[in-house]
Structures are given as structure tokens and as C-alpha cells.
């Protein structure tokens, strides 16, 4: 291990205790599989501590599904480290080329079961306090329940720099091994401004959406353009993997109210929030957004109960696995 590095025995099943950030590398050991929350739930401070003590990552396999806002290639922490992923971002390009990143194409619903069934030694998660001071997980719960079920030990960094969404799951300290205080900022994603072509496409598709339909949206200029053209629709619902600024706007204007949904009536179901600081601020007081893991947001048996379900996604290109690149060519 690096100079000054000390190993900490993970106390499985004991009441959570608080650690310093520089204690986190001591939790890792060769041969471990470590789940790392992705997107806006990434435990930024703990990853920075691990990156600063790279020898702690020797022969460690990290599991993370990142989005473009996640900049780490976790396999780069040590020459013998690996990262298992189900989604490829530009930051993973070098790791893929060298074999450090192991890419398994998989649907999100199946990823949940895959994570729940794999041997996970440690889950690194993130949280913050809500306006009442209750510690809640960050605004990405897509695989949260799976990781909590699979992990032998759970470590949660708690940021004091932002306020947690009002409806994110509460961190039960009896189910957590360690808590780590930090001052990481909430992770935001730039709002997509549709270009002229996207706006035209958006207008065409918006005409196909009927009053009372339930929407699911993805990342990209075209979904953003479609949402921007729905101000004349009524009683729309929302059930999807992510909520963004466009969906927030339609909820605020009343176009999306969830009243036509036979399940989760009046609620807006999502696995994560991906957008501006304004979106995250809005979530600190909004009671209508319901965060659920991918075994609910992406389960066909759940979706089949929602009539008029409309999935809004876009593609720049499609690979041989049938996976869609939503934004970047080349």
C-alpha cells in the first residue's frame, strides 16, 4: 500500500460510524469488487480519495454505469484495476482500448438483477441532508436497491454542500457500515438547447402525442425539442429512467400532472435527476416526484399497466449491439 495507507476492517452488520475521507482507501483490498454509484449519485469525494492513493485500488474491480458527467475511468486508478460497465462514455475510451474497462451490453432492467446477484464487497454511494436534516440518498437510485442487497458493506458519503431531494430514499444508518462527511457539490448536466433541425423534428413528433399519454424521455436535443413543444397537451403522465429540466417545466405548467395514470396517479416516477442546478433545487421541495430503482422504472410488467405509454428517445447512430448513441458522432 502507499505510504501512510492503513487497512480498515469493514464491520459488517454493525451500526454505521463516521470515517474521515482519508480512511476510505483503507477499506479496499486486492480481489474486491466495489460498486460505485453513477451519474449524479457518484461519490465524488470518496473517488478522489481513492485516486489520491492509487495503490489501494490494486487488483480491485469497480462496477459503475457512468454518464458523461462522470469523468473517472476507474480502471486507471491502478494498472491492475478494472472497471465493469454497461454504458460507455468518452472518459472510458482509453480503458476500453487497454482492456482495463470491461463492457457488457445490457438493458437497465437486466442490469439491476445482474448487480443484485453479483458478489459485491463494498458499495460506495452518496447522499445529502434534506431541508429537515434527514440524510437521503442522492438523486440517482437506478441500481441503489440492487447494490444495497448485494453489498457486504455499504459506505455512504454525505455532502453538506447541497440539499437532498425531498422524496429520495432515507439512509437507514442501521443498514450502513460507514458514513463519510464531505462538501461535494451536486452534479449537474447542461440543459440541451435544440438546434433548428431538432426543433423541426420535435414539432413533428409532438403532434403524435395525445392528451393523457404517459411519457418516458431520454438524453439529447431531439427529446428536449419534443418536450418544448408539448405546452398544448393536457393530463400527461411521466414514468422513466430520468427526469430533466424539460419535464420539470411541464410539471410546473400543469401539462404533466399524472392524473391519467392508473398506477402512481399524480406522481412522476423516475430513477434519477439529470439537469441543471434549478432542477435539483426544485426537487428539494417537490413531493410529486417519486424515485424508484430500475426494477420498477424499466420493468415491462409495470409499464404494461400504463396505457398510452410513449417512449421519446433519439439516435445519432446505432451500434451492432443495437445500442443508441444519442449525442456524439465519431
What are these regions (language model features)?
Residues 8-330:
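Conserved alpha/beta enzyme-core scaffold
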Amino acid at each position: 500500500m502507499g505510504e501512510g495507507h492503513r487497512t480498515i476492517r469493514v464491520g459488517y452488520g454493525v451500526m454505521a460510524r463516521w470515517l474521515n475521507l482519508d480512511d476510505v482507501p483503507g477499506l479496499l483490498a486486492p480481489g474486491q469488487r466495489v460498486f460505485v454509484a453513477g451519474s449524479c449519485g457518484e461519490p465524488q469525494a470518496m473517488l478522489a480519495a481513492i485516486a489520491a492513493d492509487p495503490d489501494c485500488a490494486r487488483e480491485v474491480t469497480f462496477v459503475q454505469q457512468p454518464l458523461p458527467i462522470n469523468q473517472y475511468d476507474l480502471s486507471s486508478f491502478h494498472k491492475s484495476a478494472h472497471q465493469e460497465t454497461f454504458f460507455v462514455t468518452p472518459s472510458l475510451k482509453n480503458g476500453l482500448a487497454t482492456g482495463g474497462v470491461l463492457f457488457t451490453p445490457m438493458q437497465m432492467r437486466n442490469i439491476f438483477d445482474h448487480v443484485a446477484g453479483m458478489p459485491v464487497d463494498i458499495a460506495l454511494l452518496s447522499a445529502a441532508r434534506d431541508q429537515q436534516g434527514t440524510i437521503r440518498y442522492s438523486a440517482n437510485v437506478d441500481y441503489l436497491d440492487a447494490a444495497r442487497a448485494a453489498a457486504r458493506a455499504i459506505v455512504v458519503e454525505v455532502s453538506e454542500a447541497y440539499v437532498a431531494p425531498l422524496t429520495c430514499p432515507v439512509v437507514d444508518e442501521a443498514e450502513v457500515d460507514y458514513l463519510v462527511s464531505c462538501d461535494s457539490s451536486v452534479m449537474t448536466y447542461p440543459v440541451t438547447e435544440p438546434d433548428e433541425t431538432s426543433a423541426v423534428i420535435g414539432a413533428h413528433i409532438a403532434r403524435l402525442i395525445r392528451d393523457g399519454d404517459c411519457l418516458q424521455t431520454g438524453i439529447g436535443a431531439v427529446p428536449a425539442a419534443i418536450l418544448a413543444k408539448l405546452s398544448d397537451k393536457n393530463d400527461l403522465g411521466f414514468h422513466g429512467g430520468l427526469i430533466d429540466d424539460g419535464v420539470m417545466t411541464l410539471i410546473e405548467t400543469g401539462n404533466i400532472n399524472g392524473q391519467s395514470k392508473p398506477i402512481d396517479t399524480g406522481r412522476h416516477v423516475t430513477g434519477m435527476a439529470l439537469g441543471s442546478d434549478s432542477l435539483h433545487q426544485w426537487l428539494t421541495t417537490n413531493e410529486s416526484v417519486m424515485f424508484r430503482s430500475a426494477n420498477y422504472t424499466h420493468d415491462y410488467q409495470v409499464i404494461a399497466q400504463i396505457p398510452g405509454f410513449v417512449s421519446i428517445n433519439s439516435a445519432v447512430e446505432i451500434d451492432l449491439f443495437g445500442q443508441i448513441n444519442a449525442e456524439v458522432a465519431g
